[in-house]
Structure formats: structure tokens, C-alpha cells
A protein has these predicted regions:
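Bacterial N-terminal signal peptides that target proteins for export
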Residues: 2-13
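Cellulosome-associated attachment modules in secreted, modular CAZymes
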Residues: 20-28, 228-293
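Cleaved targeting-peptide boundary
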Residues: 29-35
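Structural signature of tandem-repeat unit edges
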Residues: 37, 42-46, 56-74, 84-99, ...
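Consensus positions within tandem repeat domains that build extended binding/scaffold surfaces
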Residues: 77-79, 101-106, 124-129, 147-152, ...
Length: 293
């Protein structure tokens, strides 16, 4: 009889444990929720995805916009890490999602494509590291930082676009992306950390003159293709040489008789004082007179 009671008690405890898994209260406004294979933390009226049922046979995951009417705003650190069954993840429906945590998709070795939508503001360090099947990444968001090792060791990565909102690329962000052949970097990037493109032997960077990207490429012996035309100081008409025609055009511009493009204005500021005036005219004339074409 004692064995029978003990057995019934064990069954009761197990049933109670499973029941509690679907809603575990942590505080007055914080509890766990399990639904559709996801584990959520409801906190401050927002849902954070913090885990996934690895035994779930679904390989294509769509992150929802809400859970129990609470907006899904974050994917917690390591939420999907080491999920080798996962082949695709979609954020299209998750319009409340603002951030992806550290290691969130670390070593999800079967994912082939990631599309980061415009409403997402931040990506955590190591977020997609070791996603070795990842081929394409499209970033349409307002992220300002590609953090440390975010796409490190994504050995199949062939294509990624980096939006103009990005100002900083962290250390080893793309290390060992051996399949990556080209990447365009905007003028807005102000910092590229050491090793950002370490061991990317097939990479060519595309960008602009006099930028951080150009300097980084030169310092690290990475091929660099310019997307703009080199502006020569004093070449006001942008014909590739400095002569009397530039002086005449600049005089007309100062007199209000001609209009210059942005590049021409940059070239016209010969003494680099950010003022276009007769001093620049004189300086260009002197330059020409000395025969320094």
C-alpha cells in the first residue's frame, strides 16, 4: 500500500511540474510562458523569448509579434544557441522586436539566410557566430553597431549588406568568413576594430575616398574599390587637372553667376578653411603659376 501511495504521489508531482512549466510566477509582473515551442519571460508587460524546445521538430521558425497580447521585444542571450535543427528564422511578423541578445543564434549550423528587419535596433555580440551554413544576410534595420564576432566563423557567408546607419564594426565581427568576396562600407563608418575581417582571404571592400574603410583596407592589405571619384583640390570643374578654367569657374561661383556640385565646392576650398572666397582663387592662381599641375 505504501508503494501504491508513493507511486501516486510521484505521478502527482510530475503532473504538477508540467503544469507549472506553462506559467511560473516570479514576481507580481514576471512569469514564464511556454507556447508553440517557445519559452517566454513576461516582464514589465513585454515578452522576451529566452528559450526554445529543442525536441520540437519544427525547423522553420517564425518569431511572433505578441504572446498572450504582450509584445515580443527581445530575443534573450543564447535563446536559440546550438539549435542545429533550425534551418530558417523569420522576424517578419515580429514588428515589436527591438534587440537580439548575445549568442542568440550561436552555432545554429543549419541556418542559411537571415533577414534583419527595419524595426530592430541592436544585435548582440556573437549573435550569429559559428552559423556555418549561413550564406546571405540582409540588414534593413537602424543598427549602429555590428558587434564583436557577430558573424564570426560564418564560413559559408557569401553576401551581406551593411546599412548606412552602421557607424562601428567590432573586433572579429566577420573573422574567418572565407566565402565572403565583397562588402560595401558607407562613409558613415567611424570605427573598424582590429581583426574585424581577419582571415577573409577572398574579400574585396567597396567604399569611398578619405574614409575609415579606405584606411582600414590599406592598413590590412585588403583590396579596396572606390565607388566615388577622387576630388582633386583646386580642380573646380572636375576635369582632372588644375588650370585657368578652374579659376574662371570659381570666380563666377563667388560672383553668384555659376553653381557648383558638392564635389566641386569641396575642391574649390583650396586652403581648407571651409570658406569659398577670393583667397582660394589667389591660392589656385599661385599653384598654377608655379607650374605644379
Amino acid at each position: 500500500m505504501i508503494k501504491t501511495i508513493a507511486k501516486k504521489l510521484s505521478v502527482f508531482v510530475l503532473a504538477l511540474s508540467l503544469l507549472l512549466m506553462s506559467a511560473v510566477q516570479f514576481s507580481a509582473d514576471s512569469y514564464l510562458v511556454s507556447k508553440d515551442g517557445f519559452y517566454y519571460l513576461i516582464e514589465n508587460s513585454e515578452a522576451v523569448i529566452y528559450g526554445y524546445d529543442y525536441n520540437n521538430r519544427t525547423t522553420d521558425i517564425v518569431v511572433p509579434n505578441t504572446i498572450s497580447d504582450y509584445p515580443v521585444t527581445k530575443i534573450a542571450p543564447r535563446a536559440f544557441s546550438n539549435n542545429t535543427k533550425l534551418t530558417s528564422i523569420s522576424f517578419t511578423d515580429a514588428m515589436s522586436l527591438k534587440s537580439i541578445g548575445k549568442y542568440a543564434f550561436y552555432a545554429c549550423s543549419s541556418i542559411e539566410e537571415i533577414i534583419i528587419p527595419g524595426w530592430l535596433n541592436s544585435i548582440g555580440e556573437f549573435a550569429f557566430q559559428d552559423c556555418t551554413s549561413l550564406k546571405n544576410v540582409s540588414i534593413y534595420s537602424n543598427v549602429s553597431v555590428i558587434p564583436e564576432q557577430a558573424f564570426g566563423n560564418c564560413t559559408s557567408l557569401e553576401k551581406i549588406n551593411i546599412p548606412s546607419t552602421v557607424k562601428s564594426i567590432g573586433s572579429y565581427a566577420f573573422y574567418n568568413c572565407s566565402a565572403l568576396t565583397e562588402l560595401t562600407l558607407s562613409k558613415n563608418i567611424t570605427d573598424i576594430a582590429n581583426g574585424a575581417f581577419y582571415n577573409c582571404p577572398n574579400l574585396t571592400l567597396y567604399g569611398y575616398y578619405d574614409t575609415v574603410a579606405e584606411s582600414y583596407a590599406e592598413q590590412n592589405n585588403i583590396p579596396f574599390v572606390h565607388l566615388d571619384k577622387k576630388v582633386i583640390s583646386g580642380d573646380v570643374n572636375l576635369d582632372g587637372k588644375i588650370d585657368i578654367n578652374d579659376v574662371t569657374l570659381l570666380q563666377r561661383y563667388i560672383a553668384g553667376a555659376s553653381v557648383l556640385t558638392d564635389d566641386a565646392v569641396k575642391s574649390a576650398d583650396f586652403n581648407k578653411d571651409r570658406i569659398i572666397d577670393v583667397i582660394d582663387v589667389t591660392a589656385i592662381q599661385t599653384f598654377i603659376a608655379h607650374g605644379q599641375n
